[in-house]
Amino acid sequence: MADRQDAERSGAGPARQSVPVASLVAEFLQEHGVDRVFGLQGGHIQPIWDQLARRGVRIVDVRDEGSAVHMAHAHTELTGQTAVAMVTAGPGVTNTVTAVANASVSRIPLLVIGGCPPIPQSNMGPLQDIPHTAILEPITRLARTLRSADQVLREFDEAWARASGDRGEPGPVYLEIPTDVLRRDVPPALQMREHLRAKPKRRPQPHPDDVAAVADLIRAAEKPAIISGRGARTTDGTDLVRLLDASGAAYLDTQESRGLVPDSHPAAVGSARSAVMRDTDLLITVGRQLDYQLGMGSPAVFPHAKVVRIADTASELIDNRRGEVEILAEPGAALAAIADALKDHTPDTSWRDELKAKHRKRAEDYRQALHSTENGADGHIHPNRIFGALDALDGDVLDLGETIMIADGGDLLSFGRLGITKARRYLDAGAFGCLGVATPFAIGAALAYPDRPVVAVTGDGAFGITATEIDTAVRHDAKIVVIVSNNRAWNIERYDQAENYGLVVGTDLADSDYAGVARAFGAHGERVTDPAELEGAIRRALANAPALVDVVTTQDAASPDSGKGLGFVPDYQALTPWNDAEVARRQEGI
């Protein structure tokens, strides 16, 4: 009898006549390839939680709901498969807001399932009742309460399509189902099971006239450049490399597209970024917004450039700087078509070759600095030495090319973007600048790819935001290594206060023992105060993951972004040199 009740509860077995909504939701997720869900349990979502567990879906239970969304974010970004976070009503939902906003700005497809009080209790002051959808609607592609049991599969099908960008910009979606609806049975005739089937994403093709126009612009350009973003990840990089070869363009990636083009390629000139942006006469963006990280595409930052935009969503096509040609199509298809149109073109690569020489020299100079930067005046380790130690271990206990690297923090993120050069898969918070992603991103990465090393380097301030997720890593055996640059400060802001205001206030942190925190949660933890100890500590951490290395670093180290005024927040641009150029452009226009 008990076995039969279990079968009916799960919606499985030949005895089934009707299926509870929670079972339909679980079946939908499985049909769409979901084999794990990140979440924090609560009574409002227990019916789905139970169904997923009974079906063998792995539940990754976390310590904070925002971390569940961060883990889902990392899973989606690394695997390309839409991931799921599940949280209970009220504070469970509100705790996700920052992480959902981060995924929204990063255009990451994911599904957040929230709890919702039962319909009979509506407007009566029920437990954890708050207008979830009104809160989340501005930062999601869809936020909806599902009240009709027989429409749930249709609603999930639509939400999944919206998350993937099938009807616009990709990003997070939010669905909630009142608990009483989750328990309702739906008869077979009303289940709408045709919505269970996962559907392939559409691949819009470029118009031949647009392809020809871009090819003509490339032929006429002397200094073409291509900048890629997250939208370029619809391809494996093959078509992008083909176009770089056919066009002779210089290439800049962003944190969104790291690894699509190997650093060894003649076009890869990331260390000469400023020169590319200043001198290019044809800028081609591929799946990349022209946001603050690219000077908003301003003529002050790209003074000589005609612009071509290629993307499969309008948000990466028409923001800030319109293109001479704008191609709304699947980026891989557009790149391949343009490369084909240039098959008889012999590009002049002299400008690119000069940039490559500069790139190699600067990259090597910086690599040497990673190994030799002196301690600060306070006697503590320079953050560069963390990345130098990782570089020294490359080819020994690490293959940095196969290592999933994560950077988090203010100053530390700036150091990390320069110090992490070999990893083909790299994550950071992206354009939203959300701190606290390192540990949850690392857990999501390690569970998705348990056979690959996962190393997260984070500032101490950023680490503290989600430090309790070390417990999650231990419980779920996520083999992560977290390296904390412990300079006892919110240092990018501290630098701004000292330089621009002359008063340091509210930016100093305690000299906390983060290795001790890790050990308290059951992870391996070591503290390092001498740069000579770094390699050994990281080696032991890799062998005993999950692990944390607490590196006592200097406050004297100002990151490149600090030096360029990122913490100051200039009036017109994110960085002072760009802001100065913008001011000059506006004065010339007066």
From Swiss-Prot:
InterPro entries: DHS-like_NAD/FAD-binding_dom, THDP-binding, Thiamin_PyroP_enz_cen_dom, Thiamin_PyroP_enz_TPP-bd_dom, TPP-bd_CS, TPP_enz, TPP_enzyme_TPP-bd. It comes from the Bacteria. This is 2-hydroxyacyl-CoA lyase. GO terms for molecular function: acetolactate synthase activity; flavin adenine dinucleotide binding; lyase activity; magnesium ion binding; thiamine pyrophosphate binding. GO terms for biological process: isoleucine biosynthetic process; L-valine biosynthetic process. Binds 1 thiamine diphosphate per dimer. Pfam families: TPP_enzyme_C, TPP_enzyme_M, TPP_enzyme_N. Induction: 29-fold induced by growth on 2-hydroxyisobutyric acid (2-HIBA), but not by growth on acetone (at protein level). This class of enzyme could be engineered to produce biotechnologically interesting condensations of formyl-CoA with aldehydes and ketones. Activity is stimulated by thiamine diphosphate. 2-hydroxyisobutanoyl-CoA binds at G43, Q128, Q255, R273, S274, R362, R417, D561, S562, G563, K564. The C-terminal lid closes the active site upon substrate binding. It comes from Actinomycetospora chiangmaiensis (strain DSM 45062 / JCM 15998 / CCTCC AA 205017 / NBRC 104400 / YIM 0006). It catalyses: 2-hydroxyisobutanoyl-CoA = formyl-CoA + acetone. Coiled coil: none annotated. Belongs to the TPP enzyme family. Mg(2+) binds at D460, N487, A489. GO terms for cellular component: acetolactate synthase complex. The active site is at E493. Residues 566-590 are annotated as: C-terminal lid. Its EC number is 4.1.-.-. A homotetramer formed by a dimer of dimers; active sites are located in the dimer interface.
